């Protein structure tokens, strides 16, 4: 699903995509970025506009999605924004690029491609990131309670390659930690950034990238300890994503 305002094709239709700019507040201005999943292209085209030196690759498994995004969602036809009809994991396996930012935006509420959630995939992503690069993931889950198992499994799986992880719930007016919502996970291998420093960086960045609320998004970071001893590490041999989604009531 996607959407666009006809009067302003770059205006945010779904708020969660603005949260991806927190990766810049965390890791600095990227020079190369990979988006896995295109949809209507809201996030890639915003990054294309807001970071004039940024080279963007997008791996989208469905060629028809690319065609529709170009025709109806005003995704720019520009050398800095390259669209590839490819599965995101296979694209990385065949690539020699190292990115400053990898954005994984290929999960639906009730359908998650399990091969993009596993220990092996995150190892591959880490190999294709610069040492101070950021992996950003859009997941739909809760941060606490019985509907949080998918999120907590992702966090446990990420731990092996990404010692520093930051979670930003898209609160949308309520602060119920047990409610299903978009969660933006940022994962890094570089030194941990203190929350006050992250908030200050987001406040400075917000005006530049046309996201006035970016400071507030940063301040909404989830800081409670994430309990992971009762959820599995996701692997290529065992990634019970469908079972986790069923437990959350998403299937």
Task: Write out the residue ranges for each language-model feature.
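Soluble small-group transferase modules, centered on the S-adenosyl donor enzyme superfamily
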Residues: 1-3, 168-251
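C-terminal substrate-binding/active-site "lid" region of AdoMet-derived donor-dependent transferases
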Residues: 124-194
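Residue-identity detector for threonine
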Residues: 12, 17, 24, 29, ...
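Acidic/histidine-rich, surface-exposed loop or edge segments in extracytoplasmic proteins
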Residues: 1-5, 135-138
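The AdoMet/dcAdoMet-binding core of the Class I SAM-like
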Residues: 9-137, 144-151, 161
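Generic detection of intrinsically disordered/low-complexity segments and helix-coil linkers/edges
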Residues: 10, 66-67, 156, 211, ...
